[in-house]
């Protein structure tokens, strides 16, 4: 029992950024006013519940968890995929994705290590396939503004991307979202 391999979800983030950059260019060419990321399931839920007029602006691109799990299943359909991450909103995302079998929080995996008396710092290093190296922008997805930057560096004309970072779904962040909803609905030019 245990894990036989690990893949960095940042590889999936690179795929997401590639696809979101293409989608952004297509949307802007057809005259859309704006596009938002789809990478955070809590953000997408907040838009659905509180700013539904902005929903059409949310990217159709799948999230990094999906793409990395898909790659793992394509290597071997019998592989069991377990996403380990800090965000509890990822649990629902994993439950809704056919390529993801399980989701553990960082806290849960830490508790498992303690229960099994595994000292991670004392474990022998394992060689990893150097072809599976994510880009810096893929690794920075979780940083505030990281998704927008990853998309920007992939655009044919990066100067066309004017990004606004909404850091958190607190009252200030929700007010910013509401303002973008008004722009999308035409209530504000």
Predicted regions and their residues:
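Iron-sulfur-associated redox domains of electron-transfer enzymes in respiratory
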Residues: 1-189
